[in-house]
């Protein structure tokens, strides 16, 4: 069934507008907002679903509400951050007549402060995720620029051993310093596996169901 003429004309007008270069910066901001919202849902919804049903107590309704709230918060913040970042990038480029490396840092600095500056569980997870990747990237950049000498051996095994040694030491003796979701995961792995009563909570369930 063919679309009505009015709808076809509207779609043609919209597509013509989208192809005009003079509106590209503004349209990129809008699409960035869209992509941020979609990516936030893709990343947070599965994570919240798994973590909530594994570690959170409460009714099914409470669990679903927690999943929806976490997904909405992540999606909204990421969408607004992309919108803010691309808007500030475009503004700086327009004012200074070109792009500079510092523009990216300043735009993201302001956007990060505004959208991810609140100290909560979701922002903490996002920032820690980025911290590890930024440190890796800076080390690689340092090697590329010659500030850090390139090693003749692969440091990855040593790095892995140190990280795993530290995280288990922190979990066993300084647990409050670890992020809550990491504490929950490690408790499930290393402490809950020390307790069982019969076959049901040895192989089938993690913990025995309360008797009625």
UniProtKB/Swiss-Prot annotation:
Q: Name one GO biological process term.
A: ether lipid metabolic process
> Source organism's superkingdom?
Eukaryota
Reported tissue expression: Liver.
Membrane topology per record: Multi-pass membrane protein
Keywords attached to this entry: Glycoprotein, Membrane, Peroxisome, Transmembrane, Transmembrane helix
A GO term from the CC aspect: peroxisomal membrane
Q: Name one Pfam family in it.
A: Tim17
* Principal subcellular localisation of the protein: membrane
Glyco sites are at 206
Query: Mind telling me which residue stretches traverse the membrane in this protein?
Result: 97-117, 151-171
- Localization (cell): Peroxisome membrane
Return the similarity comment: Belongs to the peroxisomal membrane protein PXMP2/4 family.
Task: Describe the subunit structure.
Answer: Interacts with PEX19.
Check the record and name the PANTHER family matching this protein.
PEROXISOMAL MEMBRANE PROTEIN 4 (PTHR15460:SF3)
Q: What is this protein called?
A: Peroxisomal membrane protein 4
Encoding gene per record: Pxmp4
